Amino acid sequence: MDAPATASRQPIAEEPRMSQESSLSTVSTTSLVFDRLHEHNEKSYHSSSQRRRAPSASRGGYADHPDDDDDDDESYKEADTNDLETGPFLAPASVMMRRVGVDRGLKKVILILAAAFLFAWGAALFVFLSNKSYKHASTIDHDPSATSRGSGKPVTLDQVISGFWYPTSHSISWIEGPNGEDGLLLEQGARGKDYLVVEDVRSGNKDSQVSANVVQSRTLMKNPWINVGGRQLAPSDTRPSKDMKKVLVSTDRQRNWRYSYTALYWIFDVETQTAEALDPEHPDGRVQLATWSPQSNAIVFTRDNNLFLRKLDGDKKVTQITNDGGPEYFYGIPDWVYEEEVFATNSATWYSEDGKYVAFLRTNETGVPEYPLQYFLSRPSGKEKPPGEETYPDEKRIKYPRAGSHNPVVDLLFFDVERGDVFSVDIDGGFADDDRLINMVLWANDKVLIKETNRVSDIMRVVLVDVVARTGKTVNTIDVGELDGGWFEISHTTQFIPADPANGRPQDGYIDTVVHGNGDHIAYFSPMDNAEPVYLTGGDWEVDDGPSAVDLKNNLVYFVATKESSIQRHVYSVHLNRSDLKPFTDTKFESYYDISFSSGAGYALLSYQGPKIPWQKVVSTPSSPVSYEHVVEKNEDLAENAKKYELPILNYGTLKVDGVELNYVERRPPHFDEKKKYPVLFQQYSGPGSQSVHKKFAVDFQSYVASALGYLVVTVDGRGTGFIGRKNRVLIRDHLGYWEAHDQIAAAQAWAAKKYVDPARIAIWGWSYGGFNTLKTLEMDAGRTFSYGMAVAPVTDWRFYDSIYTERYMRTPQLNPSGYDQTAVSNVSALAGNVRWLMMHGVGDDNVHYQNTLTLLDKLDLNGIENYDVHVFPDSDHGIYFHGANRIVYDKLSNWLINAFNGEWLKVAGAKPIVEPKARV
């Protein structure tokens, strides 16, 4: 069978581990010894004729200190570059050696012994090779759990940036059949097939038991284009109706924000293979969102922020549902902050299963302040400047609610398709308009379950609305701030469980992720208004994705959790009555899995993401009556590359800080030697609930630094991050940046005490929240542990960031003024205590505004602080890509770090002019 759906090369965030398939063979050991003999001889030769000053732990004790006038022997430097770990990127300390004369007789004895040794070694090598025991390192499978590496090439920065090391992955567009058939997928653009085809995932399998139940494939679109009015248009996206008689096709898509876009929409008829405009009277009207009715008889869509309905009953008339949509009123779609922080999608429209009602969000941005984004080279507004004004920058103004400012006012409205009217349902005891966040909307037959919180996200109301009776009530109120001082995270995995008395489900219910004990677990609420659930999971571990799927026939709930280890992920199932919790994946091996289930949960795309080379399979689940397995991706090319290149040695462990066990991964250079003194780069993100230490396979920038530059790279997930217990997560509330920085400093102090670490050369870096915590760490440490730092797109004051994210962790500036003062990067005198640091930012960043960097620069100017470098990128957003900027970011990080660890930045402070260059001898 062809690989289902679309293959893509996806970056995966971390380095892996592999099972210990094979230890070092005799030959690889011999190779290592041979390499070290050569290395020893070469170094001994140069050290006998060259004096080098060993650095002390003090600031002035760098090997490349500007006062080291005797470090000018070019022959030494040239030879030294052959060792990646002591070459141009790493200036090692050497001990002083004296030349000792040797008499001729002793020389003769030494030569005879050397000749005998070489003869014996050659004979042993001949026997060794003749026994065919030799295996070159490039033929040995990559083992991420290995404690040493063989020979190979270093990882390059070009490879990391180009995607050379990205595992190939596939996604499946699972689709439910018109009659509820399970295991169907949507194939688009598959080689040798029609353009859009519905396939049974088991098609092509020769097993008679499997093939007997395969649903016949069905072509929806033959060609990779549609003809409209004599024009051939290429689809940007395709969405079949549930009955598979029509396809909603979008063309000419234009991006707006992270998830949102506008496009032209067309209705494609499968039988006639013809297309017509979604709105025949406005065929070129750009649509923001279009959604099928579950009954396949209508499409609801948003255009110009108003909601419309197109019925497919032969009448091509379009009904306008709302009329006052515009720049400040949105219907059926989220505004910027709800798209970014709440729904993580471009949709705020929800159809009832019977197609009789449409729930949609109304967003009023009238009171939300605007933030101007300036573009100096591009014109994202699409507006041409009038003659004579072409040199002025383009400007895009977005309604961006910052912490403490006015939030958009949101309401949930309903459209009765049969009556044609819009209505709302008032609920007693609700949050005030400026204090209400609507986080989730879920249809449950003719009822709607709504989760809303106050704006600081520590009180939740669960509301149940009866759309037929047009009434509603609050069924549960939870004050988690009172419970543990924490907050509610937004979840989109809540699933409706319809009643089935014959199958042990007497009433409707739902499954949700809830706070239970010291973490996130899944619970079953039934009936719908029950506030006391059955907890399906519990214990000293957490559910990461749940419910991932529900098999209603067998009452099985699938989920992904950290039950084996906080840095692993396995898939499990549990019965709705809480019995029979068992793993679906093999838990005997360290693994990190992701999974995508078919509509009926009978099949799944199982993605193994590490620590070995990633692979993917389509498999049957315990819910399927027939066993099935098909390998989709082996990543054989990646496996071959991993054999040929020297990937870092991965050392996983835990570090105890203030009694809390923190996960870490230490990436060591391929030929790590505990007798050497290594610089250390700490890389972290540190954001609330995030995780950077895990068992995924990844070869990334950190891998390049360890492999090619020869530095140690350490990642420690400090308090505030995810999956180390809720108590350790919510500790950071009201003072972001304090415990995160504290734990990075504690980790750096632990590494500085190690014998193989040069304590004078320790740096830290991060992007976004990681950039913020880099600066907070440098500020708190004031140069006592960290010498250098690199911050990309950092927040420097949380009063500048969006309200929904910030207030969840900090509450409002009005409620927590001292917290905001303390969390801002403001102690610039402490920053002056570091040797040097780097800051980079995109001028067109719509997420973390460039104002963050400019404000910090002004504080530095006011205090005369100059020990930093800045690089800004015009027109780049938070990802920094405009005009090849992303490559420049990583080039800058790499080169800046090399200069830092080579001691070059020590020469910048107090620089003195050289009137006449020093003559070379």
UniProtKB/Swiss-Prot annotation:
It is found in: Vacuole membrane. Residues 22-33 have a biased composition (Low complexity). The active site is at 768 (charge relay system), 845 (charge relay system), 878 (charge relay system). Glycans are attached at residues 131, 364, 577, 827. Signal peptide: none annotated. SUPFAM superfamilies: alpha/beta-Hydrolases, DPP6 N-terminal domain-like. The chain crosses the membrane at residues 109-129. Residues 1-108 are cytoplasmic. Its main location: membrane. Residues 130-921 are vacuolar. One of its GO terms (cellular component) is plasma membrane. GO terms for biological process: proteolysis. It comes from the Eukaryota. Residues 1-87 are annotated as: Disordered. It catalyses: Release of an N-terminal dipeptide, Xaa-Yaa-|-Zaa-, from a polypeptide, preferentially when Yaa is Pro, provided Zaa is neither Pro nor hydroxyproline. It is an enzyme of class 3 (hydrolase). Type IV dipeptidyl-peptidase which removes N-terminal dipeptides sequentially from polypeptides having unsubstituted N-termini provided that the penultimate residue is proline. This is Probable dipeptidyl-aminopeptidase B. The lineage of its organism: Eukaryota, Fungi, Dikarya, Ascomycota, Pezizomycotina. The gene is DAPB.
